[in-house]
Amino acid sequence: MKKFHHLGLITHTAVSGEVWYDSLKVWGTNPDDDPNRIEWVRFAPASPLAETPVAKMPHISWAVDDLDQELQGKQLVVGPLQAAPGVRIAYFFLDGALVEYLEVK
């Protein structure tokens, strides 16, 4: 089952409420704190995602129960990656839009 999780937008300046995710070398806000479920993301130059489409364009994120199952048949741009303890993510294009699937265990 897929459920809308957030809209990820790129920023190049610090945003109030952002936290550091060391595993990905990014700063990000929590979409749970935004009424429109927006996640602001800022990439450090050393981020493994810095030179990928993930760091260059917005994405729509869907929470999924089983990431591996949902990714079957998808041509991945990035991932799957361990974003945080218990959180796995992967990105792919769907009709020209960048999509993130996110699994929380």
Residue ranges and their predicted role:
Residues L94, L98-K105:
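Short, Lys/Arg-rich amphipathic alpha-helical interaction segments
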Residues H12-Y21, L49-A50, V54-H59, V104:
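Short low-complexity stretches enriched in small and charged residues
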Residues R37-M57, A63:
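Short, conserved turn/kink motifs that form compact alpha/beta structural patches or helix kinks used as
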Residues M1-A46, Q69-Q75, P80-D95:
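Core segments of cupin and vicinal oxygen chelate
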Residues H5-L9, P58-A63:
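Short cationic amphipathic helices and targeting signals
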